[in-house]
Amino acid sequence: MGTEAEPPSPPSPPAQQQEQANPPVWNAQNQKPARLYRLVLFFIAGSLTAWMFHAFSSSNLAWKLRQLHHLPTAHYLQTRDEFALYSVEELNAFKEFYDKSVSDSVGASFTEAEQTSINEALVSLRMAQDMYLTGKDDKAARLFEHALALAPRHPEVLLRYGEFLEHNQRNIVLADQYYFQALTISPSNSEALANRQRTADVVQNLDQRRLESLDSKRDALSAIHESNAALRRAKKEAYFQHIYHSVGIEGNTMTLAQTRSILETRMAVDGKSIDEHNEILGMDLAMKYINASLVQKIEITIKDILELHRRVMGHVDPIEGGEFRRNQVYVGGHIPPGPGDLALLMQRFERWLNSEHISTLHPVNYAALAHYKLVHIHPFIDGNGRTSRLLMNTLLMRAGYPPVIIPKQQRSKYYHFLKLANEGDIRPFVRFIADCTEKTLDLYLWATSDLPQQIPMLIQTESEAGERLAQMQSPNVAQRSSILEFYESGSGALP
């Protein structure tokens, strides 16, 4: 039998014939979707990888920011968001600068003199601890203070002195401040971190109670009618005092009597420079502007701040008054932003000043922060301190507080707390402003009380203080003395 022939295959359809005739073209067309699919997968995978890397970097950066004082984050002040001085945008803008500052400070080497001071401080520290263990607390305290004076930024000195203050002196606020400083210098210091975790909440509660006490005194003062003659006299005296002390902080040598004479008679004082006269007249113009206009405004703008500065400097330097500086300036160890950055920084400051966020701040905290932020930017060639203090008092007055007087005798402490704020902890400066606020409230309340003799608002010299105290007949001499000592001693500590 022969093999059966296979039936012929049916003819291919035209489409199949075309596909068989051109197989390479069909394969290329079939591979295009696969290649596009792979590109999409690669893009998604790359995006996820980039996102994960960014998330890791952000979390790592956030950890660093919480530990380092150079970056003003929420950790900047009691880890509370409302105290952060800068926005996230500002943090990103300044990150490179701060990272360089940290690396420079870590890699800095000590001079021979500095190393000698550190070695001596560590010897004093060991002796202080020995004295403390043997119950000689007074000697231990002096040795701790000596060690701190020799090495004020040594983590071990800050840590041990803080522990002594916390457990022996019961000064938990100052101890917490030193723990904070130790962490800013040595972020990985586990002892300092543990100590601060123990004290932070306690100190925060103490600060809150202090602010509530200020509110109570403010309310008591607000309850006194404006027609009260003693209140009117106190306000007039406080006006002279405010100008005298504010220009005195900047180095003006006029006495209180001379300041009052210039403001009341507009007559020159022999032996004093024209600039010193003009500084007083400029402050007078600025305070009248605040009382007549600024304190009633809902929002304070850059224009308002420029107008305030224009009056402060109007008699001293009318060309620079109300104008941003055009040169770089240096303020001690602080290097303010360059003139090219001032417009942007002041716009951000204006937004912060009028943001809804500030409604969560206590008025004293808000005013102190505004003071610090403006003086930190340092937008003017001169008059920054006076303008910042005037702005602070404007904000306090809008909240029902009287203008706060920062005594010129407290000048060194005032600048020291500003320096601590630049180094990362603004709380001591806020507490200092709270101290001054309380003393000012006490003086107003005392002046309007039923005591037979009113307490003097402020005293210029120790001899004058002694003379006034001898004239007082009130039985509560101790409290009178404590208020006077605040303005005379230079400690600024509350009794």
Curated annotation (Swiss-Prot):
Per-repeat ranges for TPR: 121-154, 155-189
Swiss-Prot/TrEMBL catalytic activity: L-tyrosyl-[protein] + ATP = O-(5'-adenylyl)-L-tyrosyl-[protein] + diphosphate; L-threonyl-[protein] + ATP = 3-O-(5'-adenylyl)-L-threonyl-[protein] + diphosphate; 3-O-(5'-adenylyl)-L-threonyl-[protein] + H2O = L-threonyl-[protein] + AMP + H(+)
Residues under site feature: Important for autoinhibition of adenylyltransferase activity: E250
Activity regulation statement: The side chain of Glu-250 determines which of the two opposing activities (AMPylase or de-AMPylase) will take place. In response to endoplasmic reticulum stress, mediates de-AMPylase activity. Adenylyltransferase activity is inhibited by the inhibitory helix present at the N-terminus: Glu-250 binds ATP and competes with ATP-binding at Arg-389, thereby preventing adenylyltransferase activity. In unstressed cells, disengagement of Glu-250 promotes adenylyltransferase activity.
Sequence intervals crossing the membrane: 36-58
Entry GO CC: plasma membrane
Membrane topology, as annotated: Single-pass membrane protein
Residue ranges annotated as motif Inhibitory (S/T)XXXE(G/N) motif: 246-251
Highest taxon of the lineage: Eukaryota
Domain Fido: 300-435
Pfam families associated with the record: Fic
Sequence positions that bind ATP: 250, 331-334, 382-389, 414-415, 422
Active-site residues per Swiss-Prot or TrEMBL entry: H378
Record region (Disordered): 1-23
Record GO biological process: detection of light stimulus involved in visual perception; histamine transport; protein adenylylation; response to endoplasmic reticulum stress; visual behavior
Gene3D superfamilies, alphabetized: Fido-like domain, Tetratricopeptide repeat domain
Role description: Protein that can both mediate the addition of adenosine 5'-monophosphate (AMP) to specific residues of target proteins (AMPylation), and the removal of the same modification from target proteins (de-AMPylation), depending on the context. The side chain of Glu-250 determines which of the two opposing activities (AMPylase or de-AMPylase) will take place. Acts as a key regulator of the unfolded protein response (UPR) by mediating AMPylation or de-AMPylation of Hsc70-3/BiP.
Protein name as annotated: Protein adenylyltransferase Fic
Origin species: Drosophila erecta
